[in-house]
């Protein structure tokens, strides 16, 4: 016994948010029982407007799931009798050769060149076959503006193209392959499919529509409905959509590649339709169909519409230990008024879902900023406050920041922004900061500093060596690629000369034979052989260069892999070393002792310090600290002074200072940061507990490590001479 129901097709992907929901993928077919809509009070005719119904409960025939889905994400197809489930139809496949029939060599070759059916190559949510995607991406990257793309045949034979298509997709390195070879492989792919991308089942309907083509919106809508018919396997529809996106992108740069919609349709309509299956009388109509499809942007998916309102889930008492009544000041993840730089430092190299909250930089009362780690980057989200309510956007519905954060520790932020599909998983706690320095006496900490610094220096040298090798290899690879392109152009020129000479040589040889001039015949043949020999030499040279390039590209990838494996260790070692150094500095350890542990008593680097000189004028802050002076006054004070003369003043940037120093006869300015870890010119060197300590350090250490144009030390305080 069957019941009446309705069919819908998914227009957008939807990822379920509740247990009772089901996932949707573009093109999924869904069935809804008529009785379920009647029970909700909907009348006949409303089933055709699912966006007005809101959430529907039905069965996804594509995935076999049953549950709720949003009506704004689907379109109505029609009525359907609902019966017990039947086995899914098998995807189309080539027929076997009848027993007893003989195969010619051509048949064997053709069978060997047949790819799996599209339905066997991929499945949603993938948008197209992996190999096709890789070919298209490589072609668009290298040949989007190539004036001979898809119109010039490469020198590769059928076997070579088939070998390329047979390769394991992830292992294929298409960067080294000429764009014309890629284009031929792309065409070969379409021809080697057992069935055309547009199956023969819809030829007749397309042909009947074709004479009516007037580029009208009505025709395009009819064509869309036809191509997206359930009679076409879903993978065919997705593949066609992907190809049309590619063709549309090419047509957008037709001023350079000369591939407008008409030219593309002439090239590819035989491959998409396989004209052998259709009457030659209809060729022009089918070309026109593809031209219309390429010329429109209907294949560009629009953003999914807003979800319809859904009844709120019944609230249950939280049993995860979260307390919405906790004060914000007591929350471990609330850090108060800290800078963005400090936040970046705390979230550096952390996992996705790590978060903290700070006061908003706008300083508006009640506004805060949530910083969340997602995709290896920090995402800043403003928390708004109005009329006693909090939230990321209107309407503001949470009674407190604590309630807001606790909500999104259980629910994905995709509710707020679809791109933020992550929960607030790992709070950065202000109560449980890692205590890196475990030792309890200065000498033990100093030994550890020496140990970590040694490891850091070794890793740095290894990384620098790999980086030099990486840069050199990259340059050599680029040179070889350029040389291969030059070889290709040279071979092309020589082959054209060879064809020209061959064409004219026949005429002259016939002429000289009639005249009996054997000497001229031999000269022509000798020149022709010489030209052919030269072409062979160039082709051999190109082949050897391509082999070298392939080996070097493998080495290049290996170097890159090793650099990436070292980088996290290097970052962690630097961070640990700097924390040990900062601990010792805060304990008042003299610079000479730090120098010994760092092993650079006789060298100058970022931590190198000379013996403290109690007689230096730098100890008197009045010789260089000029207070609230501005840039113009600073330049007037320093004009005509020798290199290294400097002063420190308050910066126009609130809470910071500026250093003005004479370099090569000119006055330069640089900001001195004031952070929670201390003063400094840049991270991670904001380590100095006072401006005086910073000035004493850079009295003998060049500023060049922070700025290439500042190769100078803070040698002479601006007022030092007057005070002596």
From Swiss-Prot:
GO terms for molecular function: 1-phosphatidylinositol-3-kinase regulator activity; enzyme-substrate adaptor activity; ErbB-3 class receptor binding; insulin binding; insulin receptor binding; insulin receptor substrate binding; insulin-like growth factor receptor binding; kinase activator activity. GO terms for cellular component: cell-cell junction; cis-Golgi network; cytoplasm; cytosol; membrane; nucleus; perinuclear endoplasmic reticulum membrane; perinuclear region of cytoplasm. One of its GO terms (biological process) is response to endoplasmic reticulum stress. Pfam families: PI3K_P85_iSH2, RhoGAP, SH2. The modification Phosphotyrosine is found at residues 467, 580. Isoform 2 is expressed in skeletal muscle and brain, and at lower levels in kidney and cardiac muscle. Isoform 2 and isoform 4 are present in skeletal muscle (at protein level). Gene3D superfamilies: 1.10.287.1490, Rho GTPase activation protein, SH2 domain, SH3 Domains. Changing residue 409 to Q: In a patient with severe insulin resistance; lower insulin-stimulated lipid kinase activity compared with wild-type. Coiled coil: none annotated. SUPFAM superfamilies: GTPase activation domain, GAP (SSF48350), SH2 domain (SSF55550), SH3-domain (SSF50044). The modification N-acetylserine is found at residue 2. The record marks 151 as: Arginine finger. Polyubiquitinated in T-cells by CBLB; which does not promote proteasomal degradation but impairs association with CD28 and CD3Z upon T-cell activation. PROSITE patterns: RHOGAP, SH2, SH3. Changing residue 649 to W: In SHORTS; impairs interaction between PIK3R1 and IRS1 and reduces AKT1-mediated insulin signaling. Residues 80-108 are annotated as: Disordered. The modification Phosphoserine is found at residues 154, 279, 608. Residues 113-301 form the Rho-GAP domain. Changing residue 326 to I: Does not affect insulin-stimulated lipid kinase activity. InterPro entries: ISH2_PIK3R1, PI3K_P85_iSH2, PI3K_p85alpha_SH3, PI3kinase_P85_cSH2, PI3kinase_P85_nSH2, Rho_GTPase_activation_prot, RhoGAP_dom, SH2. The SH3 domain mediates the binding to CBLB, and to HIV-1 Nef. Binds to activated (phosphorylated) protein-Tyr kinases, through its SH2 domain, and acts as an adapter, mediating the association of the p110 catalytic unit to the plasma membrane. Necessary for the insulin-stimulated increase in glucose uptake and glycogen synthesis in insulin-sensitive tissues. Plays an important role in signaling in response to FGFR1, FGFR2, FGFR3, FGFR4, KITLG/SCF, KIT, PDGFRA and PDGFRB. Likewise, plays a role in ITGB2 signaling. It is linked to Agammaglobulinemia 7, autosomal recessive: A primary immunodeficiency characterized by profoundly low or absent serum antibodies and low or absent circulating B-cells due to an early block of B-cell development. Affected individuals develop severe infections in the first years of life. Belongs to the PI3K p85 subunit family. This is Phosphatidylinositol 3-kinase regulatory subunit alpha. It comes from Homo sapiens.
């Amino acid at each position: 016994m069957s019941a009446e129901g309705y069919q819908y097709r998914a227009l957008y992907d939807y990822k379920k948010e509740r247990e009772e929901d089901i996932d949707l993928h573009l093109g999924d077919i869904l069935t809804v029982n008529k009785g379920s809509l009647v029970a909700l009070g909907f009348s006949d005719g409303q089933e055709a407007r699912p966006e007005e119904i809101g959430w529907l409960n039905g069965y996804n025939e594509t995935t076999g799931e049953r549950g709720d889905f949003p009506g704004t994400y689907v379109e109505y197809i029609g009525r359907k009798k609902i019966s017990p489930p039947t086995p899914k139809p098998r995807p189309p496949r080539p027929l076997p050769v009848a027993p007893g029939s003989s195969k010619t060599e051509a048949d064997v070759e053709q069978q060997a060149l047949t790819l799996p059916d599209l339905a066997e190559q991929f499945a949603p949510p993938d948008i197209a076959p992996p190999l096709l995607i890789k070919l298209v991406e490589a072609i668009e990257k290298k040949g989007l503006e190539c004036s001979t793309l898809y119109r010039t045949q490469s020198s590769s034979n059928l076997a070579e193209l088939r070998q390329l298509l047979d390769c394991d997709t992830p292992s294929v390195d298409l960067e080294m392959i000429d764009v014309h070879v890629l284009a031929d492989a792309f065409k070969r792919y379409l021809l080697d499919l057992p069935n055309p991308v547009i199956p023969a089942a819809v030829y007749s309907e397309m042909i009947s529509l074709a004479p009516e083509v007037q580029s009208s919106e009505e025709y395009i809508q009819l064509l869309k409905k036809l191509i997206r018919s359930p009679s076409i396997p879903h993978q065919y529809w997705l593949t066609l959509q992907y190809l049309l996106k590619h063709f549309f992108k090419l047509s957008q740069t037709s001023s350079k590649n000369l591939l407008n919609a008409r030219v593309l349709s002439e090239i590819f309509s035989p491959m998409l339709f396989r004209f052998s299956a259709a009457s030659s009388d209809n060729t022009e109509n089918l070309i026109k169909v593809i031209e219309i499809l390429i010329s429109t942007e209907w294949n560009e998916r629009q953003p999914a519409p807003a979800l319809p309102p859904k009844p709120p889930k019944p609230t249950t008492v939280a049993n995860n230990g979260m307390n919405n009544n906790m004060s914000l000041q007591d929350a471990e993840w609330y850090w108060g008024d800290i800078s963005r730089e400090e936040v970046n430092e705390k979230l550096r190299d952390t996992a996705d879902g790590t978060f903290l909250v700070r006061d908003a930089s706008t300083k508006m009362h009640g506004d805060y900023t949530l910083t969340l780690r997602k995709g290896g980057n920090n995402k800043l989200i403003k928390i708004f406050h109005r009329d006693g309510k909090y939230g990321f956007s209107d309407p503001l519905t949470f009674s407190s920041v604590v309630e807001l954060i606790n909500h999104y520790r259980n629910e994905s932020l995709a509710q707020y922004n679809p791109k933020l599909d992550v929960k607030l998983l790992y709070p950065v706690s202000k109560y449980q900061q890692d205590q890196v320095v475990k030792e309890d006496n200065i000498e033990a900490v100093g030994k550890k500093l020496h140990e970590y610094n040694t490891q850091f220096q070794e890793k740095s040298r290894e990384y620098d060596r790999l980086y030099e090798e990486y840069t050199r290899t990259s340059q050599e690879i680029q040179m070889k690629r350029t040389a291969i392109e030059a070889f290709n152009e040279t071979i092309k020129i020589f082959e054209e000369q060879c064809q020209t000479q061959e064409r004219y040589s026949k005429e002259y040889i016939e002429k000289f034979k009639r005249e009996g001039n054997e000497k001229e015949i031999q000269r022509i043949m000798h020149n022709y052989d010489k030209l052919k020999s030269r072409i062979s030499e160039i082709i051999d040279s190109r082949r050897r260069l391509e082999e070298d390039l392939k080996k070097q590209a493998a080495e290049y990838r290996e170097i890159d892999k090793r650099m990436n494996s070292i980088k996290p260790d290097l970052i962690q070692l630097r961070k640990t070393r700097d924390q040990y150094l900062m601990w010792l500095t805060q304990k008042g350890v003299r610079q000479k002792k730090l120098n010994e542990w760092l092993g650079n008593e006789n060298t100058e680097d970022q931590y190198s310090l000379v013996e403290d000189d109690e007689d230096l004028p730098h100890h008197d802050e009045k010789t260089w600290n000029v207070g609230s002076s501005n840039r113009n006054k600073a330049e007037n004070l320093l004009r005509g002074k020798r290199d290294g003369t400097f002063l420190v003043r308050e910066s126009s940037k609130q809470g910071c200072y500026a250093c003005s120093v004479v370099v090569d006869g000119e006055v330069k300015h640089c900001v001195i940061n004031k952070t929670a870890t201390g003063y400094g010119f840049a991270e991670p060197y904001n380590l100095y507990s006072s401006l005086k300590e910073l000035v004493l350090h850079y009295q003998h250490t060049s500023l060049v490590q922070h700025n290439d144009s500042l190769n100078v030390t803070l040698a002479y305080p601006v007022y030092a001479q007057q005070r002596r």
